[in-house]
A protein has these predicted regions:
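Structured secondary-structure scaffolds
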Residues: 1-48, 100-104, 148, 154-369, ...
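N-terminal catalytic cores of NTP/NDP-binding nucleotidyl/phosphoryl-transfer enzymes
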Residues: 2-75, 94-109, 114, 131, ...
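A glycine-rich helix N-cap at a beta->alpha junction
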Residues: 76-91
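Cys/His-rich short segments
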Residues: 115-168, 172
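Helix-rich, typically C-terminal accessory recognition domains appended to large enzymatic cores
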Residues: 120, 343-380, 391-499, 609
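Beta-strand segments within the central parallel beta-sheet cores of soluble alpha/beta enzyme folds
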Residues: 287-290, 474-476, 576
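Intrinsic disorder at enzyme termini
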Residues: 470-551
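Phosphate-backbone binding interfaces of nucleic-acid-interacting proteins
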Residues: 531-652
Length: 652
């Protein structure tokens, strides 16, 4: 029987610099899903790679004094090295500078032009170089890019445009009739309310102001817009040919089963990409999942903030599987996760060294101490054994359910319940006490057999997330690899097998102070900048004219509790909150959609200016202002009371 195919992709990494752990998280997440699908019996094809064209790269190469091709060769090689370091099992690593890809992009552009989906015109508006994105003045947030918060520059040039509106209704209908196409649900609502329903503008799909890109075949002074170039990797990488015979691989694999991408590029993958595919008369991918960000403790990772953590640095401290464990286990399904060195040490010591490592070590040590390493099922059972077996046998179905819903962190939590239950079983059965009674020797043997069998089942489920650890555990137990189907049965470990004589430490405990001292050596304060107290960032603002105490006293500040929050239709940046202030509830509109979801807002207590004259923003009445702070990268943070305060409390 032929295996069912499963085609999974990540967004291809932009080659502007070395990827940090937040970038690396995505490929590790995709790898865990791909590995699990293989365990389920699917014929998996996992594609990742690098996005290598664009103005930003041209400028970076110029700064480095090398050609753009030399620059991307270096960075792409570094990205691939890190993906390999993280033990990712991709089947293809595509580069957008690959000859086959560039050839097909030219043909795709030409086909779209021949269909009159692309036409020639002039572009005048704003352009964000880091995001390689065009915006109108009205789309900017305080004059900055609505996606990354950086300044945009005016752009005026001859360009080709794609008729996005031609396919808008068809895409809206597709999204409405395919509820799983965009996940999580909140991402779908954002795309519908902020982009599709208000109406799509035609998209600029070529540039003439720089040269580092794929030339338009019939008008070579133009280069293809980097997103049209990059998105097509999902089909060119598997052999698509728009005016010839596509490969058997393409016919087998397309449409993709899952595009796994960051939430910040969901628009490109759920609006631009589906419309491009419609233009090519190709089916749409089955699902696009916009995962949350992995943040440093003080916000989104940024080189300008100096808070970047790199995967290879983490691996040097903790090992590959410990890093995989952390990024997979700590990332929620929808909201952003946090990574810090301190949290990594805590998780390694508590979960990996104690819960898992200590369990394996104790079990092997007791097997050697009491039975010379031989593990036998003597069949002397008690009710506690059935409790253990029933619990362990219930876990694989739970893991399967979570993985099918892409709730990878929840799936890992389920796996670790097996190891925690085995530790509890040791406390319940007390093998050391059984060993003191010769008449209970067979009971002791049964207990140790149950522990070994439980660990084997847990290790099999762990394989997709921490493959090296699974291999090391099974090797020490002298156990064979199992299929997921085998996990419906408890007792497959061969009775009479012998475990290793000297158990290997899976995860050594770390001393936090020692780790932080080494981190400080790794990332010393820059010589030209004095070390800031408590690692706090500072921003110097241009001073505004002084005001009197009387003027300041006219403003009223109170604590408000957000009891409801909704997105403002036809706005890309506004949220509308219902805020309880004393016995009143006020409606306040805030430009913080890029920084907080509606779910995150509800329940928060915030600082509010309550005596501003009501005004309409995007046609919605606003009766106050919620206060935020903004850092140098444009990230906003709500100002909240340090201690618990009642709604309505005066801020003085």
């Amino acid at each position: 029987m032929e295996k069912q195919k499963y085609y999974i992709t990540t967004a291809i990494a932009y080659t502007s610099g070395k990827p940090h752990i937040g970038n690396t998280y995505e490929v590790v997440l995709a790898d865990a899903i791909a590995r699990y699908k293989r365990q389920q019996g699917y014929d998996v094809f996992f594609q990742t790679g690098t996005d290598e064209h664009g103005q930003k790269i041209e400028l970076k190469a110029e700064e480095a004094g090398i050609t753009p091709k030399e620059f991307v060769d270096n960075v792409s090689g570094e990205i691939k090295r890190i993906w390999d370091l993280m033990n990712t099992s991709y089947d293809k690593f595509i580069r957008t500078t690959d000859e086959d890809h560039e050839k097909q992009v030219k043909k795709i552009f030409k086909k779209m032009y021949a269909k009159s989906d692309i036409y020639k015109g002039h572009y005048e508006g704003m352009y964000c170089t880091p995001c390689e994105s065009f915006f109108t003045e009205s789309q900017l947030v305080d004059g900055k890019c609505p996606d990354c918060g950086r300044p945009c520059v005016p752009a005026k040039e001859e360009a080709y445009f794609f008729k996005m509106s031609k396919y808008a209704d068809k895409l809206i209908d597709y999204i409405n009739t395919h509820p799983d196409f965009i996940q999580p649900e909140s991402r779908k609502n954002e795309m519908m309310n902020n982009f599709l329903l208000p109406g799509l503008q035609d998209l600029c799909v070529s540039r003439t102001s720089f040269k580092w890109g794929i030339p338009v075949d019939f008008d070579p002074k133009h280069v293809v817009y980097v997103w049209l170039d990059a998105l097509t990797n999902y089909i060119t990488g598997i052999g698509y040919d728009c005016d010839g015979e596509s490969t058997e691989q393409f016919k087998k694999l397309w449409p993709a089963d899952l595009h796994l991408i960051g939430k910040d590029i969901i628009r490109f993958h759920t609006i631009y990409w589906p419309i491009f595919l419609m233009s090519l008369d190709l089916p749409l991918p089955k699902q696009v999942f916009g995962h949350p960000w992995l943040l440093q403790g003080d916000g989104k990772m940024s080189k300008s903030k100096g808070n970047v953590i790199y995967a290879d640095e983490l691996v040097d401290f903790f090992g590959v599987d410990a890093v995989r464990y952390f990024v997979l286990h700590e990332m929620p399904f929808e909201n952003d996760g946090v990574i810090t060195w301190e949290l990594m040490v805590e998780r390694l010591n508590s979960e990996l060294a104690n819960t898992l490592g200590n369990l394996v070590n104790r079990t092997i040590s007791m097997s050697n101490k009491y039975f010379g390493g031989v593990v036998e099922n003597k069949g002397v059972t008690e009710p506690v054994d059935d409790d253990l077996k029933n619990f362990i046998l219930s876990v694989p179905a739970k893991v399967n359910e979570k993985m099918d819903k892409l709730r990878v962190a929840d799936a890992m939590t389920e796996v670790f319940t097996i190891f925690k239950r085995c530790n509890k079983y040791i406390d319940e059965t007390m093998p050391w006490a059984l060993a003191k009674d010769e008449e209970k020797k067979d009971r002791l043997a049964t207990v140790l057999y149950n522990l070994v069998e439980g660990i084997c089942i847990g290790a099999t489920l762990l394989k997709s997330f921490m493959p090296e650890t699974t291999e090391r555990i099974l090797a020490q137990l002298n156990a064979q690899d199992r299929e997921l189907e085998d996990l419906k049965t408890f007792g497959l470990y061969p009775s009479g097998n012998k475990v290793t004589e000297k158990p290997e430490i899976l995860f050594a405990r770390l001393d936090l102070k020692e780790v932080m001292a080494k981190v400080a050596e790794l990332h010393p304060p820059k010589a030209e900048e004095p070390a800031k107290e408590e690692n706090e960032d500072v921003i110097d603002l241009e001073a505004k004219p002084e005001i009197t105490f009387e003027d300041f006293g006219k403003l009223q500040f109170q604590v408000g509790k957000i009891i409801k929050c909704e997105e403002v239709k036809k706005s890309k940046k506004l949220l509308c909150s219902q805020v309880q202030i004393g016995s009143q509830v006020r409606q306040i509109v805030s430009g913080i959609k890029a920084h907080y979801s509606t779910e995150e807002m509800v329940g928060k207590k915030v600082m509010v200016v309550t005596n501003l004259k009501p005004a309409k923003l995007a046609g919605v009445l606003s009766e106050g202002m919620i206060l935020c702070a903004e850092d140098a990268d444009g990230n906003l943070s709500l100002m909240v009371p340090e201690k618990e305060m009642p709604a309505g409390a005066e801020i003085c």
